[in-house]
Amino acid sequence: MTDLPGLRVRAAAAFSLNVRLQLTFAVLLMAVAGFACAEHMEEVVVHGEPLSPFQAQAGMAPLAETNTALLLKRVAGANVNFNGSLAGMAQYRGLYGARVNTAVDGMDIGNACSNNMDAPLHYLPRTRVDELSVIRGIAPISSGLETLGGTVIANSTAPIFGTADGFTVSGHTAAAGQSVDGGYSLSGDAALADRRHRLFVAASYEDGSNRDFGAGTIRPSRYERSAVDLGYARQLTTGVLSIDYRRNDTSDAGTPALPMDDISSDADLLRAGYSAVWGVTGLDATVYWNDIEHLMSNYRMRPARSGMRRDNAAQADTLGWRVSVTRPLLGGALRVGTDGHAYDYDADVADPDNAMFFMQTFHNVKRDRYGLYAEWVHDDLGPWQLMSGVRWTHVSSDAGEVNASMAMMMPALAMLRDRFNASDRSRADDQFDFAAVAAYALSDSVSLELGVARKNRSPTYQERYLWAPIEASGGLSDGNVYIGDVELDEETAWQFELGLDWRTGRFDFAPRVFYHRIDDYIQGIPATDPAVIMVGVMNGDPTPLQFANVDAELWGADAEWSFAFTDAWQARGVVSWVRGKRRDIDDDLFRIAPLNTLVDLSYRAERWSVTLETEVYARQSKVSLTNGETRSPGYALLNLYAEYMFPRYGLQLMGGIENLLDKTYRPHLNGINRVAASDVAVGARLPGDGINIFVQAGWSF
């Protein structure tokens, strides 16, 4: 286990459009204003950050890869549920979707698609990624509001303050292209900075056609996305004040594993910050606001049956904050804090051929979370290092009354509507979490780690407020239609972990074994209500599923390792295995990654390097009968990368070939194809990319 590095204390404020939180924001804004007249000081580092010892970094794959989430395959225990070129959900140790807390530039982005086309990492284009890491094992309770499935941290590139009184200009530009979809990306950023000010602007653009695989083309899988970032920071006597804005526009992004495609996802992301240190006390606060408008369609990028053309317009607004104070206590560091996340959502379905048709899929949905926590870290107790924390989180949710034009002609649908509207939709949960991790150094190179935690998660709006059986399942992509349950209970997980860190400098090996016991796990089960079944039949699924509380358990092991043969020759790899089962019946959990490993062998000279990489996935035969999941065969891939640098000119060139042998393979975590006009059969799992030749160039100044 490595030493605990420094904690950078940050803070934030933002404009509030939510009346319920105006008082909170006013207090934070006044705190920022109170320091606005302060003078310059160096950025302060306070030791005691509890996250870094347990982080596992994702290797940086080529810029040509547009789906940022796919980088997670390079982390032990992590993977990605793939539904489209820009649609990827983080999976960690068999848990995914809302169970995995994902922080993008410190924000918990409330996405606008009920099928997670725009999962959080969608809003950090690959060209802007500076860091993508997973807090390995049990996530500290300070890392987020609901961290039952772990925490993923993604940060974009950002400039630093200058070292002189005069302003200097710096920046980076890059261009990349790849053959698998004829795609290309362009990006650039520039900064103007001195000791006290830091002004930043960045832009990126990505465009690609349908993706090829060994036996044809996946349709539709084309995409287009652009992003613009603006940022400003000011160093003050007691800290740093910053404000950042991102505009992300996605258009015509195919998602063949889902019933509709992403026609547009237009997002405004605003984050403001302030950091301060007084003596040994540090303040860290972040306030952010996200507004996302999203349009889905089942006919604009794929053929639709006559009379069944549909558009779905959705909007999501998020207001969030994190405030914490850190100071020494009993030889360690104590952090106390509060965080919150207020989320509003609406989604309406329309028929472009019939102005009278409408369906309020989700209406006036609110899901608000507020938390208080305390966490203590000590990294110098002789051979011991300790982290422990407790958290209280309040989750409240509600939804407005719904309606649908088809209810006038479908008594079963009218019954479901009336039952939902008459129900008590206002719900509240109080969660109590704790986490404790201890590491013991057996020697200078070997340490043991033991962790235990209790984590909770409340139902998502889909699981609770989906009032009619349709395929708005949070991106499960199993071909089933789902209906929610207002009466769902929260999930409660007991988590246990045992690990070893063996680090000699030349050889590093860090295995972990884990066990999760989850009570009231939320899973679709066969619906028994005749009205639900009748509407399901009319929607093309005679066996609809209803979200329900069941009992589950997951266990497994993962490891990361590296070995330096010489200063130039190095090998590294990760291996992951997880098993997920229902405890209430004899069935397996859905969409669990099979045993897999990634190994690369690299030769690194002063200015150039070459890497041969292999990915190996075992067959997955432990599948969910409830979800109708099919087994998948194993496969192995070879990738080749090369890089050359011209330090004198700030130039970097990179190229490579992925899937060198052009194998046809179907990753188990890929979704099920829904599109007839494709070389992939309807109901078959989406194949992985065929051979992909890519090149990229970058220039730093």
Please identify what each model-predicted range represents.
Residues 330, 379-386, 394-395, 509-510, ...:
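Gram-negative outer-membrane beta-barrel transporters
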Residues 457, 519, 618-622, 644-701:
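C-terminal beta-signal and adjacent terminal beta-strands/loops
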Residues 127-136, 141-214, 221-227, 238-239:
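Outer-membrane beta-barrel translocator/receptor signature
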Residues 108-138:
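Short acidic/polar hinge/loop motifs at secondary-structure boundaries
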